[in-house]
Design a protein with these regions (language model features):
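Core subunits and conserved enzymes of cellular information-processing
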Residues: 1-149
Length: 149
């Protein structure tokens, strides 16, 4: 029963998670070039690539991502669950870092990052970490589960 509770807390993002993982940081290109700005779709593609690669928990600039998380443009800003985030965008994913890195390299998300770099001057770095800590967010996605009409 406790294992099931822990799995559910991980899935809804309301518990802290610690473990090995991978970090991808994106930085907007030149401010005077509209096409050189990271947009919501870029973040969604990368997050989906990380889930596809075996991530167990993901965050963007400290905001936990779950299946119910909204990542949207709001004018010139990007919001994660209606909270503004800005460049540089730090996407952290906890999971088997070596397996995840190899799997991510073969996803469309990896190709998309290369496209952004080569065609839109958006810079990115990837790092493997032996320990990452993603904070739980009881006020975020998990809380939405209780607000059904």
């Amino acid at each position: 029963m406790l294992d099931r509770l822990n799995a559910l807390q991980l899935a809804v993002g309301d518990t802290n998670v610690r473990g090995p993982g991978m970090t991808i940081s994106l930085t907007d290109g030149p401010a005077d070039d509209e096409d050189a700005q990271v947009v919501d779709e870029d973040l969604r593609i990368i997050v989906n690539g990380l889930w596809q690669s075996g991530a167990e928990a993901v965050s963007i600039n400290g905001h936990r991502i779950t299946a119910r998380t909204a990542i949207h443009d709001a004018g010139s800003a990007i919001t994660v669950d209606y909270r503004s985030v800005s460049s540089p965008y730090t996407i952290e994913a906890i999971g088997d870092s070596h397996a995840m890195t190899g799997a991510f390299a073969s996803t469309p998300a990896s190709s998309w990052l290369a496209y952004l770099r080569d065609n839109h001057q958006i810079r990115y770095t990837t790092n493997i970490s032996s320990t990452l800590q993603l904070e739980g967010d009881p006020e975020g996605s998990a809380d939405q589960l209780q607000r059904r009409p």
